[in-house]
Structures are given as C-alpha cells and as structure tokens.
Amino acid sequence: IIMRNLGFERGGRDIMSTLKLTLLTDLYEMTMMQGYFKNNKNDRVVFDAFYRSNPSDGGYAICAGLEQVITYIEELRFDDEDIAYLRSLKIFDEDFLAYLRDFRFSGDIYAIPEGTVIFPREPLIKVVAPIMEAQLVETAILNIVNHQCLIATKAARVCYAAQGDGVMEFGLRRAQGPDSGTYGARAAVIGGCKGTSNVLAGQMFDVPVLGTHAHSWIMSFPDEYTAFKEYAKLYPN
C-alpha cells in the first residue's frame, strides 16, 4: 500500500480554521493549568501521544492528523471572548486570566510523518514544553490524531483488500459532522484512497474529487439504460 503524505498549502483556504479551537479542551486541563500557575510550576516536560491497541484487531495503524495539529498549535491564543467566558465560570482568578491573555505556545513538537505505519505504544507525537502549555494542548491533539489515524487505518486496510483496484472515499454523508467528514476524507487519501467525493476536501487539501451518480438520477429517466447512457454522454471519462 502506498500511503500519501498530504501537506496543507500554507497560504491555502482552510475553511475549518474559521472555527476557533482554543477552548477545544477538557475543563480539567484548564483547572490544572491554574493549579500549576498558582504553585509556580512551569517546568519543561515531555508528553507523548500513543495508543495501546490497533483498531479492529489489525496488525498496524496509519499516522494521520499532524497537519491539523500544527495549524491548531500555530493559532492557539485566548481572545477577549474566550477570557470573558472563562471568567463567567467563576473558577479562574484574574491573575491567571491575565496570563492566558498573552498565552502563546513556546514548546517543540516532534512527530511521526503522516502516512507512516505505526504500532501500539510508540510515540506518535512528542510535546516538549512548559507544563502549563503541554497540559493545555493534550485534549485537542488526542481528539485530532485519534480520529484521523482511525480513518487512515481503515482506508489502508480496504485498499489492501482491493488488491490494486482503485478505492475512493465517499464517507461525508455518514460522517459525524462537517469537520469529521472533511478531515476524514483527507485521512482516507493518506491511507491510500485515490480521491474523495467531498468537494470541500478537494478544495482545501488539493486531493482528487471523484463520483458516480445517485439512484435519484436513474429514477428521473424512464429506464436504467437511458439514465446510464445520458450520464455517459455528459461525462464520458
């Protein structure tokens, strides 16, 4: 199986980046951060992201999701709306909120390249950072990588079973929301799929968009043969 390493065009149009992910974290990450802050704990630490068992009793997994992790880290900052919401929870002190206002990630990220075959208990992403920063990014990194590795792995297994025949990704309508469907399409191409039905994923990630036609097309003609013939006239290739 040939896995693909797909990078974002850094100047490209990432529609999903309009959804700010700073608060995509578990509350206890924030309360622990404040605890570290109050106790003057900001030692440089190492957090490793790994998994314990292969999905679906398989023998391997495929690494995916790194590019979205990078984008998340680069854009990580607390704006006035974030600070106001955290203040409304009445569990964070003003000195800690002032710290968050100027927050920027200053650590280092080490990672296995996307498309690499991976195995249980080996680090996929290593975060080396002050403990408050490493704690904050834990949840989002796991959320992104767990989902996309799962999709890339499933795609790789399907492509292997196809024994050289082309496989396309067509999962948008059954995905758990727009971001899952779109980043899942990218992960499926990393796993070996030839392209996706998802037009937004094609625009965002410059991957081939593919498709057939629906049964509604066939039903709009008097018989199946006519429906196929008319579609073939429009799209002979």
Identify the residue ranges that each predicted region occupies.
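Buried, small/hydrophobic-residue-enriched core segments of structured protein domains
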Residues: 7, 12-44, 53-55, 91, ...
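N-terminal, Lys/Arg-enriched amphipathic/low-complexity engagement segments
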Residues: 45-101
